[in-house]
Curated annotation (Swiss-Prot):
Keywords: Amino-acid biosynthesis, Aromatic amino acid biosynthesis, NAD, Oxidoreductase. Its EC number is 1.4.1.24. GO terms for molecular function: 3-dehydroquinate synthase activity; dehydroquinate synthase activity; NAD binding. Catalyzes the oxidative deamination and cyclization of 2-amino-3,7-dideoxy-D-threo-hept-6-ulosonic acid (ADH) to yield 3-dehydroquinate (DHQ), which is fed into the canonical shikimic pathway of aromatic amino acid biosynthesis. Belongs to the archaeal-type DHQ synthase family. This is 3-dehydroquinate synthase. One of its GO terms (biological process) is amino acid biosynthetic process. It is an enzyme of class 1 (oxidoreductase). InterPro entries: DHQ_synth. It catalyses: 2-amino-2,3,7-trideoxy-D-lyxo-hept-6-ulosonate + NAD(+) + H2O = 3-dehydroquinate + NH4(+) + NADH + H(+).
Amino acid sequence: MTRSVWLKADDEVGDWETRKRRITAGLEAGVDWVLVDRADVARVRELGSVNVAAFSTDDANVIEDAEGTDADPDAYVAGKDGEGDGTVDLPADFSGSADLSALRRGHADTAYVRIRDEEYEPFAQAAAEVADHTIVVGDDWTIIPLENLIARIGEETTLVAGVESAAEAETAFETLDIGADAVLLDSDDPDEIRRTVSVRDAADREHLALSTATITTIEEAGSADRVCVDTGSLLADDEGMLVGSMSRGLFFVHAETAQSPYVAARPFRVNAGAVHAYVRTPDGGTKYLAELGSGDEVQVVDGDGRTRSAVVGRAKIEKRPMFRVEAETDDGDRIETLLQNAETIKVATPNGRTAVTDLSVGDDLHVFLQDGGRHFGEAIDERIIEQ
């Protein structure tokens, strides 16, 4: 599941200058959506590139003032000044609901429901059956029946939970272990907005179970075309990438964060191996190192198996002398990879990072093991022999 952060920035927030400051802070932090009134859509487009959701309105003047496609939101939201926010009483029979009718007729694709009491929970469920996105906001965070909505709505809609802080966002993402798909943040604090985006990123990160494999062979393998993956991010001392010749077993190769007497640290770089090798990607797939180019995403992993995404700035390919490293897993499987013969290339071991030039037969390495083969980088349930 890919989580997202929506930022509330309609006229309830304040005047346009106040809303503009909030939206700008959101753009700088990396929010995914901005929720505004219909009249502000074009203004938001001028500030930057972001998905824009707008409360739908029948105000003809607003529609006439809109200019071209810049004034068209990515999602129309029903519920403000209606039944969804309590301005209009809920009908006894939901078939007579104006908000639900707007969703059914395609006049809106997103529902906004403020949970004022228990009567609004079934209304939110009814909206979720016809809405692409369902925003639920509570007057009091503690009474939002988020667990019930997550359990009953399932995958019928993208469930967006209203929050006022990063701490509330974290709770929303973790509720029932499944969590909300997204949060709608109502805050002017740029730091709180950034923290909420960080919570989103953490919720999306895969946590891998790293294993060990024992070196059975390490030998010079001649020259090959070696790939340095230069990312657009600074990598930490315990971070690197998972690479290898066999997709079923990938080696943990550290980033070049350590100083050397011979070369300066390159904390954005992983000297990943030869062009044929696989590197793991954030979606759980793999790419050949030779395929990587600027703008691609790779998965970065740390010593505890925590992962994050990094964008590739460039892939630098040069002919270099290589080692062939072969290792055996606990179940007797054999995996291997080619790594440059240089003291600056380090791999993860139970005793810490070790230069490939210092490795010996019998040493243990940290690896990531997975079942199945790969076809165009996607896992498939098929017997594939790699040797």
